[in-house]
Amino acid sequence: RCVILACGERAIARAAGACRLLGERGVFPSLVNARFVKPLDEELLAGLEEPLVVTVEDNMLAGGFGSLVAERFAEDTSKRVKIFGYGDKFIGQGGIDELMDDCGLSPEAIAAYIEKNI
């Protein structure tokens, strides 16, 4: 069981693509549009029952939405958190889709991680 928390229009599109790919394989994660980084929706997070929490954001990993979610669940041993976003490195030039894929934000990469870790 898995929930994907996506923050940002492009991240939501990537996460939805991963859900479609997983659905073709019989895996059906929940997908939540997080809509904003702060304040965190504590009520939503407290109600998550899935053991695997995947965040997808069109943002930097350090100090981003996923970092806040990981911090929130740091003491909760029943949850594993995986963050998909941009690493702390120079990102080259190119089309947005190409750059997101290069940074590991492709629907295929997200789906592969989830399929391997559920």
Model-flagged regions — what are they?
Residues 1-118:
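Thiamine diphosphate
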